[in-house]
């Protein structure tokens, strides 16, 4: 991986974590799966809707993988983005891989899509919990520059195992949101040491 995990793209992270050459992407950008809501709002779209999903091996054993792309709308979850992850989890219940790897990088719900994004988060959480009850193991990885916030943070806490890098951040609300609601006197989002003490992987 040419870049650090912190700065890498979703596909680079998958390639770095999984066995070399083993990743087989499901619903590639060439399939042109994007959010209908963004087009209606004349907002930019991505033909993978900001999440990469597929099959791979890790240490020689089969896994399913989903990796969020923080460079597209901060990795925010919308209807199609969420549906791809939920469908991958349904596939895991059928195929019974050794684990499902969820590589998180998201600020939470895609506000452009309002309730569709909130519903997508709840559907992913329900799918994870249901799959776990059927013996599927979930491993979450957090290390992207966008962090893991909002509804995505809730999904992360549903995993069996959660791995964070020192640069990873996990919280319900991001530092700027906390500052906006409670004021800079209560929480200064520019105080990087404070931010990392509260939500960072290294305490």
What are these regions (language model features)?
Residues 1-136, 197-203:
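Terminal-region recognition feature
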């Amino acid at each position: 991986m040419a870049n650090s995990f912190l700065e890498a793209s979703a596909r680079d992270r998958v390639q770095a974590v999984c066995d070399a050459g083993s990743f087989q992407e499901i619903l590639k950008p060439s399939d042109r799966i994007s959010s209908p809501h963004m087009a209606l709002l004349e907002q930019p779209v991505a033909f993978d809707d900001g999440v990469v999903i597929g099959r791979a091996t890790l240490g020689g054993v089969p896994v399913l993988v989903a990796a969020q792309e923080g460079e597209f709308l901060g990795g925010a979850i919308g209807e199609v983005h969420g549906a791809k992850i939920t469908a991958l989890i349904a596939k895991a219940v059928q195929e019974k891989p050794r684990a499902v790897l969820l590589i998180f990088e998201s600020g939470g719900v895609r506000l452009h899509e309002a309730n569709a994004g909130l519903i997508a988060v709840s559907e992913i959480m329900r799918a994870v919990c249901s799959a776990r009850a059927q013996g599927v193991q979930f491993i979450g990885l957090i290390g992207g520059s966008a962090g893991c916030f909002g509804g995505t943070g809730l999904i992360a806490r549903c995993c069996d195992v959660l791995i964070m890098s020192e640069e990873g951040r996990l919280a319900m609300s991001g530092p700027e949101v906390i500052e906006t609601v409670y004021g800079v006197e209560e929480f200064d989002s520019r105080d990087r040491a404070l931010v990392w003490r509260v939500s960072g992987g290294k305490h």
